Amino acid sequence: MFYDNDKVNLLTGLLKAYGITHVVLCPGSRNAMIVNNIVESRLFTCYPVTDERSAGFQALGIAQNVGKAAIVVTSGSALLNVAPAVVEAYYQRQSVVVVSADRPQEDIDQNVGQTMRQYGALDNFVKRSVNLTDALGDNHSYHHRLVCEALCACNFGPVHINVPLPNVTECRMVENVHLENRPVDLVVPTTLQTDIADEIFFGAKRTMIVIGNCHISLPEHVFSTLRQFITILSEPLSDPTAQPFEGIVENLPDELLPDLIIYIGGSLVCRSIHSRLAAASDTRVWRVDADCQLCSPFKRIDRVYGLSAEAFLHQLYATVTQRTDIVPSPFVKSWDKAFRVERQRLSDSISDTDLSAASVVNYFETQLDDMFYNYHVHYANSTAVRLACRYVSGHKVYCNRGVNGIDGCLSTAAGFSASTADMVFCVTGDLSFFYDQNALWNNNLKGNLRVILLNDHHGGIFDRVRGLEQCAHRDTFVSGRHSADARGICTQNDIGYIAAKTADEMRLGIVRLLTEETNRPIVLEVTLKTS
């Protein structure tokens, strides 16, 4: 009979899936569910040892002999008793997995018996420490990732998995349970082997590469060639050949869902992509990351390739250009059609008389295409960068998407402009601009910095957050409603200033911004209608 606890069953299955078959078991009530299910599974060679200090060293000896071992202890100071063995394993680089049962989080520091702050207790002497606390939403995928992170790190030394559990009396017993057997494979190839390429182009029927925010130093023809053979969803923050896809993803038909996602880079601006792309139950997710981080916004990860984005994409490019058996799939053709429809939809949504943030960005990008000088374009977070993902084509976009805060966007562009002779443009919303106005308080700034300020006198993105329309205090306390303009800021800092309050003034202002010669920065402030 097994205890029916998802965390326990997931841990039991993954220990076996990662090749750990020798487990030292120490007595206790809090860890009884883990001990019972490990023994009951008959997948492990089990060693009962009462003294945790001795048990830790016995686990070390087993690891020295067979390669890997685990030890399971109960809650409280039992965990600290294994510390001497863990320290020794750390400096020997031996693979020892320490599993500690723990009281629920609400019992810690509440004078409940046999409790202490267990999570992090061994941090100085383990390669990875995880805590299987309960979170809102999908606990299983969250716990799966944490356990896999720890067990992958175990290849380089000891790790600690802390498992908060209820009283054993609160968990029922059943005859059979599902033991998780889906590890995350860590692959560190020097080249893209033939079998990997075959799996990408022939094993999967609907392969898709998703590229988040990152710096990829590859020529544009690499991306454009790859797009002929494989569907790529990317944003201009990482790929100058990116195609707009937000409207496609929001109404995505099942035939456009991938069965293999290859995820590269950091966060994506498009919010809906994560849940929608992973909607198909058979979707696998591979991660390409030189640091081998188990990171996936798709709530699933099956394999990690320890390659840089440049190395992986360049080797994929070499594969499609050298092999004659790789041809565009129907999936690629379906997505190409969807891209064309989305581009037309975005174009049709812009009116010549319209003065909106979208029309400003669209006109700016259209005129920028005609410029013959070198340039770099920064977009501030929030509405500005979301518009960039719709209307930018043919150049890279810079944006602080590491944490996605609005602070420092203008200062980042200013710093960029100070270190180059090229033109640097920054498109920003009003809250980002006024929050970071001291970026312009700098006598060393040159005339190569040009700013487009989209001023609708509040955080416009809050108008589109579902649920906030019911908030009676949205305008006053949430969206930062104000009546400020940038004229005074520009005057006091010797910055050129252009005001635009109509569509015609906006278009003339953008032409001036792109062509006027000056030795100081210029700000074009476009006053937009407020909702």
Descriptions of predicted regions:
Residues 64-65, 81, 211-286, 394-421, ...:
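Glycine-rich, anion-gripping cofactor-binding loops and their flanking helix/strand elements
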Residues 1-18, 143-201:
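Cofactor-/ligand-binding subdomain signature composed of acidic, glycine-rich
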Residues 89, 100-147, 234-338, 443, ...:
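Glycine-rich, acidic loop regions that bind phosphate or pyrophosphate groups
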Residues 3-84:
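N-terminal cofactor/phosphate-binding cores enriched in small/glycine residues
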Residues 99, 106-119, 125, 390-531:
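Thiamine diphosphate
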Residues 8-11, 16-19, 26-30, 34-39, ...:
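Active-site diphosphate/adenylate-binding microenvironment
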Residues 22, 66-74, 79-81, 89-96, ...:
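Structural signature of the thiamine diphosphate
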